Amino acid sequence: SAFRELVNPLLIIEQIYQRTGMKIEILSSAEQHFLGYKSIAAIEKGFKKMIQKGTAILDVGGGSLQVSLFDKDALVTTQGLKMGSLRIRQRLQELEKTTIHYDKLVEEFIRNDLMSFQRLYLKDKEIRNVILMGDFITDMIFQEEMEDRIITREEFMKRYEDTVGKSVDLLAQEMEIDPEYASLVVPTMVVCRNFIDIFNAESLWAPGVSLLDGIAYDFAEKKKFLKSVHNFENDILVTSKNIAKRYSSSKSHIQGTMNLCLNIFDSMKKVHGMGARERLLLQIAALLHDCGKYISMEKVSECSYQIIMSTDIIGLSFMERQMIACAVRFNNSAFVYYDELYSMGIAIDRESYIKVAKMTAILRLANAMDRSHYQKVKGIKAVLKDRELPDDRGFCTGHFPGTGTAER
């Protein structure tokens, strides 16, 4: 998160490369937390069992905090909040000297964001378990806990009361860490305690994994060294469906449009040449193509684009999110040539631009087939015939009755 917030990241990355020869790639917030999530999933037995009931993953970083909610083995939502332990310490550094109740000060500082999160995303959800991960400070806090690293709410509260009243120097001495890191202990504990309170959670699990575990797991999965029992792509789709639901998109229409998109995509693989990842991006674009209507019926394209670009979708890179947003934008507005994108504030490479063009064409066709939102077209089979794409009902993408002719 520190790299993401730099005003001159390219210069810093270049300096690192010049001095060390290492090439740095900055992960988006959604990518970082998705890999963290995978690191927990690597402990398959404990993770699978825990997420059967309402569970929250609390990823406490230095600059920000990510909360992911699970219910019945599915990821329901994930949200980022700017209340990392380092950020809190920096903001309250001067005030800390004026009070003997630093924990209460931290609690008041984060209360507004906590209440907003509870009002918007918890509602009637029951969260029984909290999985805690983040910076190594989390491991330091729970270094004396039992082997399975699961503690009850009562045990956590006992540790909390024993910790927050101590000075930074005393914490550094007891935990055998630098005072710089010891100063992050109280903010971390206060954040954890307040989330446990609003969740009304019964137990806390600190698996002791890191981002490196997630990167290793992701690499092994992509190279087919192992097969995960958990469906991560389904989590991305469920999250996208919940975003669409939040913006009151028609469930039947977006589901129908997505199915039509997949039918066309799968039937035309030899023509468009796109793979499984682009298929997933197309599904997400179909699910979110109507979300802008929640803000403006007149400026659907622009509003949909801004919503998607402003929403972290776990598991997607910034470039992938941009591709989805562009496909959704050009679904209703005029498609623009590559050289015009920069004037619109859109920065994608040429390869991604071609993929956006193909995704947009498929999305436009599928959306047109359900213009009435009655799902009259179902179960089509697309075939290529004489350089035209007719479906099994005799219609053709090159010519629709009453609409004129379009070139593919």
Briefly describe each language-model feature range.
Residues P390-E407:
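A short interface-forming secondary-structure element
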